[in-house]
Amino acid sequence: MKVKVLCRNPDDYVRETKRDLQRVPRNYDPALHPFEVSREYTRALNATKLERVFAKPFIASLDGHRDGVNCIAKHPKSLSTVLSGACDGEVKIWNLTKRECSRTIQAHDGFVRGLCVRFCGTSFFTVGDDKTVKQWAMESPGYGEKVEPMRTILGKTVFTGIDHHVKDAVFATCGQQVDIWDEQRSAPMRSYAWGVDSISSVRFNPVETHILSSCGTDRSIVLYDKRKPTPLKKIILEMRTNALCWNPMEAFIFTAANENFNLYTYDMRYMDSPVKVHMDHVSAVLDVDYSPTGKELVSASFDKSIRIFPVQSGHSREVYHTKRMQHVTCVRWSADNKYVLCGSDEMNIRIWKANASEKLGVLSPRERAAQNYNQKLKEKFQHHPQIKRIARHRHLPRSIYSQIKEQQIMREARRKKDVNRRKHSKPGSVPIPSEKKKHVLAVVE
């Protein structure tokens, strides 16, 4: 007698342990799942709604300064250490893990204009209104010892900014001119001057480390090579640039924060026009910093908000504000790509999540898989009207909201004026300037 028996391999359905999930047999043939797209759309819509529900970006506020925060510096070796300088000459070293100040130094008489940490993390430099550059030890002095700077350099003019080389014992200061200093010398190795106006900010390139850039009060951005005795290139804009930042992943790309409410991303090889114009702020942009991945940047503005922009996008993906936060003067992105720190006029440093709805802490494998799945669904359906509307919706203060409406009216009026001028002029006599090129006045080699 012949008996036919169904034979199954136990490895296909038996769990190894009791804690494992039950294996569910699935057939991925599209013909068997005609409503797959509609189910995915519903899941993407729910994921987008939940993202906005759980968007609580504010983490903590570090208070202790007795005057407005003027500058912030990150520690290159420690994620939990941040330094800040205030308008009363005070420098504080913060422990972000404990959310408390670990050390306070009265560094200068007047404003602390600039702050940078040495590449090894053992010391830091400050410049102030008292015409001095001071180097301080990162470690606290022993019991009974007086807090004194390791070195003090007395300058001839006021210093307005400072930045340290990524891997050499060299730093740059700016004021009436840009000076390149060796840490062991009391006189600058090189000095660069182009024009008579003062320079407000200087930054080293973290990739091409011999290149640095500065921005001045004469509306210019100047590029330098510290191996050459003269500046490389100068670009003059319509309005003044307040701060600069180099992309940490792309050697030739930098972004400038401008007084005309915009940020301009340039390729230093082609300075005739910016690569991208980042709009959305309604007041002067005071500071800018890149994420460690080089894919996003954060800006601080006089309109009491900070915004996060994707590098390839002209509009922000996120805007952060609070009722108490006043004009934001400085901003930094943490080295682990998780947090954003900003300092403002009302003497506080605030810590924000880089991704507003991100869950902090350790994720289980199932949580991580669900997050990745939801993220892919949101990317797949991001251009659908309903999902796009929910994802873009943000609550704004009334002042910012009314200024946005006012600027839209002004922009439309300028557009109509240009159209009418072109309509009543000889064909071709009135050119159509692009948004990128119309703010660049001249490039000087």
From Swiss-Prot:
GO BP, one annotated term: oocyte growth
Basic residues bias (residue ranges): 413-426, 436-445
Region feature Disordered, mapped onto this chain: 413-445
Cellular component terms per the entry's GO annotation: Cul4-RING E3 ubiquitin ligase complex; nucleolus; small-subunit processome
Renumbered residue ranges of the record's region Required for nucleolar location: 353-441
Protein family membership: Belongs to the WD repeat DCAF13/WDSOF1 family.
The protein, known as: DDB1- and CUL4-associated factor 13
Organism: Xenopus laevis
